[in-house]
Swiss-Prot record:
Signal peptide: none annotated. The keyword Metal-binding applies. The gene is folE. This is GTP cyclohydrolase 1. GO terms for biological process: one-carbon metabolic process; tetrahydrobiopterin biosynthetic process; tetrahydrofolate biosynthetic process. Toroid-shaped homodecamer, composed of two pentamers of five dimers. NCBIfam families: folE, PRK09347.1-2, PRK09347.1-3. GO terms for cellular component: cytoplasm. GO terms for molecular function: GTP binding; GTP cyclohydrolase I activity; zinc ion binding.
Amino acid sequence: MQKKFEDCVKTMLEIIGENPNREGLIKTPNRVFKAYEFLTSGYTQNVKEILNDALFESSNNEMVLVRDIEFYSLCEHHLLPFFGRAHVAYIPNKKVVGLSKIPRLVEVFARRLQIQEQLTEQIAQALMENVDAKGVGVVIEARHMCVEMRGVQKANSTTTTSALRGIFLKNEKTREEFFSLINSAKQVRF
């Protein structure tokens, strides 16, 4: 598989008019393979294993929010990066998940070929299903290089997506609290 991938990179370099045998490009096919192996490592990770090993009994039934989770991913349409911050909240149902597992969950899905809308949905659904939460809210704010570097070339434009499940979808006060905590957080820095 690695050789096939590297051969494709060499072919691409030739097609754009480059010499894949020149000094600066000799190791590029291998470097690109390693980069994509890492950037798509989410396909080989198991969400259940990550979350189920970190579920703890708890009487807490208030919102848990992990905000400003930095991530990067690859747009499935152009294979160009998009990156930003995810804000993930849930309301426990007798169990809480270890806080470090929420950013890990974001990484699992971000390290795949993605569109932002799907990434947002996948994080929300995985948390809802695997933690048995009363509700989940996910907001992602991201910049897309396929928008900034090509096509419309609109630098610094931001796309925001949200996914709500359970009580976040059904209860207006819960939803308002979630969005309020995200917005107030932008003004507080440690």
